[in-house]
Amino acid sequence: MDLLVLVAPLLMAQAPDLQVGRHVETVHQALISQGWQVSDAARRAEPLSARQRAIKAWVPSLITCSGTGAGLCAYGYSRQGDNLRLVSQGDGELVRWQLGDDWYGAGVASR
């Protein structure tokens, strides 16, 4: 049996290579190229403000953004039964992410 046939499902189940501080638009393009899709929750979400409409126009996985504080935004993806949620700061930098029940990231990205 071909080794790729045996290893491919394991590779698909691994967490994507995400890094605190990467811009969410860059992360979105990478996830889509890795076979992730915009989640049902993100497809159903309707932007509540002009800012959210602008974000959703370039990152369709947007679920919502907070209206106060750091302006954190949540994005949703799914792939083969796995759910991935991203959280970015208002400027679009990735802060943390959730794959299944597990959270990753170190809070606010340092420069």
Regions found by a protein language model. Name each.
Residues 42, 64, 81-83, 103, ...:
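A generic structural signal for solvent-exposed, polar alpha-helical segments
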Residues 13-57, 64:
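N-terminal secretory signal peptides
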Residues 2-12:
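Sec-dependent N-terminal signal peptides
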Residues 1-2, 19:
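N-terminal hydrophobic targeting signals that begin at the initiator methionine
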Residues 90-111:
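A short, surface-exposed interaction/processing loop segment used at functional sites
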Residues 55-92:
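Functional cores of ribonucleases/endoribonucleases
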